[in-house]
Amino acid sequence: KALLRLNSRIRPVTLRREGMGYHETTVPEGDSASSSPDLQSSTDFFASATAIRSLIQNPGGGHSEAISDINNPVRNPDTKTANILSSQIPPDAFYVFKKALDSGEFLTENSLDSILSYCLMKENVESLSSYMDVSEDLARRIINQQNLLLSFSQSVSVLKTRELTQTRIQRALLHIILNIHTAPTQIPFARVLGFRKESSELLSRIKQHSRIPLITKLADAQNLLDSEGNQILSETVFSSNLYEKLLCLKTGRKFCHESQKQLIIL
């Protein structure tokens, strides 16, 4: 619809999903990397993201405690878990992935438990209904079931119905936490998070000819954006800082504000 509305020359192409189902929670046996290193041949060995997250949180197959939650000590994945993960993730990505696991620098949805509880306790049906993706029916259900809501994931299970899907409720709860009431009609800026050195000339040309401001330093944003753009950027920075704060609480490392983070240059 967006392409038609913009009269775009882009031709969309659908790609058939390979491997396990979208919400499959088990990791398949076998080596996906060796079976299909370029992801082009048909195989049943591709795990879903849900299954990979489940393996990280429950390395014993659902019988052990979730590793490295916000209130639990950081615990590295065992060798068996690491080997299974390495068979499901491309080598270069697995290196970064395992580094984060070993240092405990990752969050699960239940890292938001305390924040979610606080946010829901101060709301009523009318105020909840003002958040993006929160219908009046969902707002009433949240208030009626509030005494039963414990963790983030458990809250989703309690609140979901045939009409209110798991994904919809997850989005709604995140919007409540992040204080998001409406979606912007358009994004009035582009923010660069990183680039390759050899692409610096291209970046310069984009900056010169783009119809919207290209942000490389947050300190410059206020003068480049209008009030709507600054508001959207402020919400983005808040979300990033919240994630960073939760990581710091979990790992004990020093907090780094989003405005202090350097561009990634490869």
What is each stretch, according to the model?
Residues 1-266:
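Active-site cores that bind ATP or allylic diphosphates and position pyrophosphate for catalysis
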